Amino acid sequence: MADIPAQLVKQLREMTDAGMMDCKKALVETEGNLEKAVEYLREKGLSKAAKKADRIASEGIVSVEVANDFSKASIIEINSETDFVAKNDTFKELVAQTSKIVYDNALSSAQSLHTMSIGGVKFEEYLQQNIAKIGENIVVRRIASIEAQGKGIVNGYVHSNGRVGVLIAMKFDKESSKVACVELAKSICMHAAAMKPQVLSYTQLEYEFIQKEKVALIAELQKENEEFKRLGKPLHKIPQYISRSELTESVLQAQEQKLREDLKAQGKPEAIWDKILPGQMERFVADSTLLDQRLTLLGQFYVMDDKKTIAQVLEAKSKELGDEIEIIEYIRFELGEGIEKKVEDFAAEVAAQMQ
């Protein structure tokens, strides 16, 4: 397939930041399949992960409600067709009423709204009435609720532009830890809003996904190394592993044994090995978990202290409070996430309007 529409090349370029000719070649090689073209570019080290923000087509609002005692919280995403309507007072009232009913009833699916009523009117009818008033299609795309379990709290954050919202649930053992956990949860919510972790932990990344991402990540690092070499900059280490799930007990033991042999070869006194090894093992783990650092909340370095991962921040706070603090649930909504852009043929649209 040699005849590739310019619009498709442009869309691929926006999704990947790859060069125009690279995008065209990728589409030719994949016979115009956009998804396969993205993978082709990544495997060649010509693109980072496809940017979800560039696939967002919808407008609307993400709204978060949190209980005053932090015992529960809810999050909703409501889509409109235009940004103008998203700022409309009628639309804002619809969002507020929907958010309240989701929060009050701890709903966790958009379908469950159909059993609810607002002001004595079935929700579906209420929504249709507002669509008629506003003059645009309105969709309650997704909702979620979290209730604290035992000794625990839920906190949330919605970015001021209403495009990103986050909920985090924490558990702890001591009631005296509650205030500190409320504050920390809010701070980590803000981190997640900015850094976009896809999941809470590496345990949620499937083996096949990790292996596929490894090919792309290594190609990306090798491509960057070509430029670094030209500029005389230090090169990236090319990792053998990219996720904590790959670092089995046998892998860690083998690495520690290798480090011991290295220390012996360097003539380091055996008496100080145990002081050196923890730091070296920590660096090995950091160098071998690049995927976790990109995609998992617990594996990311904290924006407020980039020397520590979120997991290490929780460990430090646990030690400070003499408690065991854990994040047990994480939800992040970004407006329009995963909705493909509609590719418009402007000439065809004008022609249709003139008929």
Curated annotation (Swiss-Prot):
The keyword Protein biosynthesis applies. It holds the Pfam family EF_TS. Keywords: Cytoplasm, Elongation factor, Protein biosynthesis. Disulfide bonds: none annotated. GO terms for molecular function: translation elongation factor activity. Residues 82-85 are annotated as: Involved in Mg(2+) ion dislocation from EF-Tu. Associates with the EF-Tu.GDP complex and induces the exchange of GDP to GTP. It remains bound to the aminoacyl-tRNA.EF-Tu.GTP complex up to the GTP hydrolysis stage on the ribosome. It is found in: Cytoplasm. The keyword Metal-binding does not apply. GO terms for cellular component: cytoplasm. Its main location: cytoplasm. Gene3D superfamilies: 1.10.286.20, DNA helicase RuvA subunit, C-terminal domain, Elongation factor Ts, dimerisation domain. Belongs to the EF-Ts family. This is Elongation factor Ts.
